[in-house]
């Protein structure tokens, strides 16, 4: 795969395993050669059931630093996992070689693929805002930033669903139910633009134009036939100057997730949680901003019913910024000298397989930055939870680089405190 890097986020480290089906990330921040001046990144997130009994890796990874200190890797690592029979989460997992996955907060450069497994990592989208977003699993209330340039526009509803060939490509479909415009990204409200094997800055002829959905919802549009280059495509297609669905099995552009996860922020500052736009550009630009004292749903994918990659269920992930960043600041492409976006300290994962929701927290292996808060996963009232997952005072309670819980009934809550 040309021009991009694959990184295995430290979910394959001791105690850090969460969701075992594949969530590849390619084409991250990829740009056409005429407009790009920096290296391109692609993230492969692999989360595994913590009770996995065997992990093997092969392949090699090499790093090359750019002028900005960003790394590029030209090789990948394959991993096979033998899932445990029990749905419970084991307290530890045999760590793998450091050349494939980081066993500490030291940045790594590698790619990993799960060939067999039984759980999932997480995806979510949200209305970005500098002020508080208060949401429950059934209701989302948002407020927008006072800066018009950095605002995100929440959309109204459209009961009839999306109509192909009606909207101009330059007219973001903000009246569609659940769709959220990310105006501050500069793509005309879209979350990302893909043209051929590159990326663009506007929704033009032949482009896939991706979009964000409200908290607790997932986008429904991606072509059933994905390219052989391993880079995912997603969003609406611009054809003849008009927008068309790429997945006509859905009338609406957004659908509700499984509904088994949420975020509760008990801090005095807001936290920007940034979902990767997958399938699609795979940049971490779809924000969930949870203000101090607020709650928000977190979208959870269903392995059996959501996007399939080469016949395997896929998950999603969130980059979790330090408290104090707005969505507009934190859900942007960062650099190694920063501590936001892809360089934010933590990564959340969530997804469902066979009725069990797997939720995880892990250290972002790209950085040694530590979160300026504590966070744990707890069960909502009446939930059945296996395992413990706590990040407190700069370390994981289990002594590893991450942790996972399995929820067989009810829902889980990521609690900032």
UniProtKB/Swiss-Prot annotation:
Subcellular location: Secreted, Cell wall
Keywords: Carbohydrate metabolism, Cell wall, Cell wall biogenesis/degradation, Glycosidase, Hydrolase, Polysaccharide degradation, Secreted, Signal
The UniProt record lists the keyword Nucleus: no
Pfam family for this entry, one: SUN
Span of the signal peptide: 1-18
Superkingdom, natural source: Eukaryota
Chief place of localization: secreted
Gene Ontology CC, one term: fungal-type cell wall
GO molecular function: beta-glucosidase activity
Enzyme Commission designation: 3.2.1.-
A Gene Ontology biological process term: septum digestion after cytokinesis
InterPro entries given in the database record: Beta-Glucosidase_SUN, SUN
Protein family (similarity comment): Belongs to the SUN family.
Record's function text: Involved in cell wall synthesis. May be required for the activation of 1,3-beta-glucan synthase.
UniProt name for this protein: Probable secreted beta-glucosidase PSU1
Native source organism of the sequence: Schizosaccharomyces pombe (strain 972 / ATCC 24843)
High-level lineage: Eukaryota, Fungi, Dikarya, Ascomycota, Taphrinomycotina
């Amino acid at each position: 795969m040309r021009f991009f890097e694959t990184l295995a986020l430290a979910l394959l480290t001791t105690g850090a395993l969460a969701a075992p089906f594949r969530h590849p990330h390619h084409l991250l921040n990829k740009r056409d050669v005429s407009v790009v001046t920096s290296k391109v990144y692609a993230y492969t997130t692999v989360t595994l059931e913590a009770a996995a009994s065997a992990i093997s890796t092969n392949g090699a990874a090499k790093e090359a630093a750019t002028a900005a200190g960003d790394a590029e890797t030209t090789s990948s690592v394959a991993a096979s996992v033998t899932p445990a029979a029990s749905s419970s989460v084991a307290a530890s997992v045999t760590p793998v070689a450091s050349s494939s996955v980081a066993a500490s907060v030291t940045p790594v450069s590698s790619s990993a693929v799960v060939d067999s497994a039984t759980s999932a990592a997480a995806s979510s989208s949200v209305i970005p805002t500098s002020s508080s977003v208060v949401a429950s699993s059934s209701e989302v209330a948002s407020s927008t930033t006072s800066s018009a340039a950095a605002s995100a526009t929440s959309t109204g509803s459209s009961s009839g669903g999306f109509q192909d060939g009606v909207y101009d490509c330059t007219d973001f479909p903000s009246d569609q139910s659940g769709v959220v415009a990310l105006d501050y990204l500069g793509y005309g409200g879209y979350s990302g633009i893909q043209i051929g094997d590159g990326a663009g800055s506007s929704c033009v002829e032949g482009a896939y134009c991706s979009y964000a959905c409200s908290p607790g919802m997932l986008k429904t549009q991606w072509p059933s036939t994905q390219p052989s280059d391993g880079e995912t495509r997603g969003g609406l297609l611009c054809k003849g100057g008009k927008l068309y669905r790429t997945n006509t099995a859905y009338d609406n552009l957004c659908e509700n997730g499984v509904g088994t996860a949420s975020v509760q922020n008990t801090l005095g500052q807001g936290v920007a949680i940034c979902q990767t736009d997958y399938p699609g550009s795979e940049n971490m630009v779809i924000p969930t901003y949870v203000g101090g004292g607020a709650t928000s749903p977190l979208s959870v994918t269903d392995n059996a019913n959501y996007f399939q990659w080469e016949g395997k269920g896929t998950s999603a992930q969130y980059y979790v910024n330090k408290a104090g960043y707005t969505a507009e600041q934190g859900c942007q492409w960062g650099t190694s000298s920063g501590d936001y976006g892809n360089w934010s300290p933590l990564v959340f994962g969530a997804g469902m397989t066979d009725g069990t929701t797997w939720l995880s927290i892990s250290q972002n292996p790209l950085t040694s930055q530590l979160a300026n808060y504590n966070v744990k996963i707890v069960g909502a009232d009446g939930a059945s939870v296996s395992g413990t997952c706590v990040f407190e005072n700069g370390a994981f309670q289990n002594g590893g680089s991450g942790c996972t819980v399995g929820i067989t009934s009810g829902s889980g809550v990521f609690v900032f405190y």
